[in-house]
Structures are given as structure tokens and as C-alpha cells.
């Protein structure tokens, strides 16, 4: 089992292109099933949206390839990364 705080300190990397996407800022949980639906990244600080807030990137749980000691590997198509 892993705690949310342990989950949040891991870097998220796209295995499709090797790019570091950032770290987890939040998670989306289905309250009916109690399962994680998606992880939400706060962005890498390069893209600022409205009022200077970082853009969020929502990654569905099914796109997670592997959760390792220091990194979470995800598979995303190029437009997302």
C-alpha cells in the first residue's frame, strides 16, 4: 500500500517520449467504488493559464504503466506531453 504523500513526491514520466511531466498535485477518486480514477499533475511550470495558475494535466489511471520507488511511468500520446 502507498500513502498519498508518498505518491505526491514521485516524478511522473511519459514512457512514449521520456519527458518528465511533473509531480502529482491531486488525485480523482470515485467515491462509489473507492478507486482512483485519475492522477492530476500541476504542470511543470512552463505553461501558465488564466490568473497565472499552472495548467492541470489529468492522467487516467489506465494510462499508468508502472509505479516505482521514485517515479511513476505513464503512457500518453504526444499532444499531452
From Swiss-Prot:
Which residue spans traverse the membrane? none
Q: Which InterPro entries match?
A: PRC-brl_dom, PRC_barrel-like_sf, Spore_YlmC/YmxH
Keyword list, A-Z = Sporulation
Stated induction or repression of this protein's expression: Expression is regulated by the sporulation transcription factor sigma E.
According to the lineage, what is the superkingdom? Bacteria
One Pfam entry name: PRC
Q: What is the name of the protein in this document?
A: Probable sporulation protein YlmC
Family the entry assigns: Belongs to the YlmC/YmxH family.
Free-text disruption phenotype from the record: Inactivation of the gene does not affect sporulation, but a ylmC/ymxH double mutant shows a 100-fold reduction in the efficiency of sporulation.
Highest lineage ranks of the organism?
Bacteria, Bacillati, Bacillota, Bacilli, Bacillales
Q: Which residues form the signal peptide?
A: none
GO annotations under biological process? sporulation resulting in formation of a cellular spore
| The encoding gene | ylmC
Q: Which organism is it from?
A: Bacillus subtilis (strain 168)
SUPFAM superfamilies found in the cross-reference section: PRC-barrel domain
